[in-house]
Amino acid sequence: MTEQFRYTDERFADIQMLRYRLDGFEALTLRQKLYIYYLAKATLCGRDITTDQFGRYNLRIRKVLEAIYERYEGDRTTVEYKALETYLKRVWFSNGIHHHYGCEKFVPAFTEEYFRQVVDCCGCEDENIDELCKVIFDPTIQPKRVNQKAGDDLVQTSACNYYEGVTQQEAEDFYEAMRDENDPMPISYGLNTTLRKTADGMLKEDVWHEGGLYGDAIKHIIYWLEKAAEVAENELQAKIIGMLVDYYRTGDLRKFDAYSIEWLKEHEGRIDFINGFIEVYGDPLGMKASWEGIVTYKDMVATQRTQTISKNAQWFEDHSPVDPRFRKPQVVGVTANVVCSAMLGGDEYPSTAIGINLPNADWIRARYGSKSITIGNLTHAYNQAAKGNGFLQEFVADEATRALIEKYGDVCDDLHTDLHECLGHGSGQLLAGVSADALGSYGSTIEEARADLFGLYYIADAKLVELGLVPDAEAYKSQYYTYMMNGLLTQLTRIQPGNEIEEAHMRNRALIARWTLEHYPSAVRLVKHEEKTYVEVSDYEQLREAFAKLLAEIQRIKSEGDFEAAKQLVERYAIHVEPKLHEELLARYKSLGIAPVSYTHLTLPTS
């Protein structure tokens, strides 16, 4: 059965759909399956919240397109109809009209005239099609979902729907006035609100809760959460759900923090979930969270790997190559599991994370710890789908390095994710008086770089061989090579010609790889073979020295809240794309006949 399972599915635009398995699901008890079912239903209810957060016109546009898709009785074989169908699929995939990675607005391959024609044929109900046409077809209207270009007003030039009639300076001043530097347990200001300017010029927050904005969707989420609580695996799970429901009803962020602390304590059950306003990557100011949901159950065998890491978290913290002032003196509450994803929703679907570490509040991490997951059935699907596609042959110049990657690549990829989530995000501390938001729009990139560097530094450590996490002292080299290759070259195939790097994880990888290339030319360089560019690593030990040095600086920036240093690193290394190199990489990728690595996953509960 496993050999016959097909991991790849439909492909459109730059998207390759993936399928994944739910191994072990059938072995769960009926009560556990019911628990997953109810949590999954709650996960599906927040979809429209995310779509609306990503742009104020998204829901209206999606509904018109869906009406056409369902009702159109004309010729569905024409080039323009097929283009409209692809556009709709892209809207479904990205939860809106902007690319999920690059944040640029989609360019429709059908005309406005054709769109109006099919709208008329279908009798689509929207009071202002003219307005929607301007948004869809005018490239100057809402060109970017999240704009991070230095010097621009990031709020007014971003299409995301977190602010209304507000400038960047007004938003920053509004939240700065709220902060209390003497509060040891600060809430995540603005996390669950839309900030808008009223008719009289005052700034007002619309809170996302049952009785407020997004209330209809939240009521449905609450309904299914309460059903789930009735069949929870233990009393603490039921209590945690009750606390989450209380937060959803009130929108009180103190209640969200209390819920997060209790959620950290629950690790006896096999099933876990995330449901709420969590990550702030979609806000150019890094404060407001998109809605997301995921339901998981533990992979009991693979979890032994992550538990080994978490049990040794204090050793890793104590031996980190950062200034001792920035280390945690006592690591508490670090738990890590390998899980199977049973359902994804909101900002976790269709393009999803493969690892998660929560909660995000630094003071909760310091006092109570964090939970990390590596989503094993998703990483397995990625790995299986990539086999035999010619990628390594095209981008790795020598056979010895290809053999190294083929031997160790899957193991080291999973392990780096474990280290990134479990130890990287959970490591270090802010100095007293430093705000978690001190790095502003650069914060997400710096945080992801910090976690990646922690993983890169330790994946080469003899401690991992001692713990049995890697088979030998050579394994880490596969991760070092593929990381540098991705950061310098192959991740650029996800970007459209003329665009820059926008997404925080991509910026982080570019920052690390380009900084290392510049500062350690005797360890790594770009070389040409037959007019093709490759990465050549000549000294892997020096690479580790580079990662250690950069980790120390990145941690200093985070701990001290050094905005200017963060800005200089990100602006210099993380954003810009060299056009000729980009053109070459896109052509080479196209020759393979595979889509850039922008995948989705279709849940198939198959054992």
Language-model-derived ranges and their functions:
Residues 21, 50, 56, 456-557:
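Long, well-structured alpha-helical subdomains associated
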Residues 29, 444-460:
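An active-site-proximal "capping" alpha-helix that borders the catalytic cofactor pocket
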Residues 416-429:
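Active-site recognition of the HExxH zinc-binding catalytic motif
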Residues 428-449:
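Post-HEXXH active-site segment of zinc metalloproteases
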Residues 600-606:
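Conserved small/polar residues in nucleotide/adenosyl-binding loops
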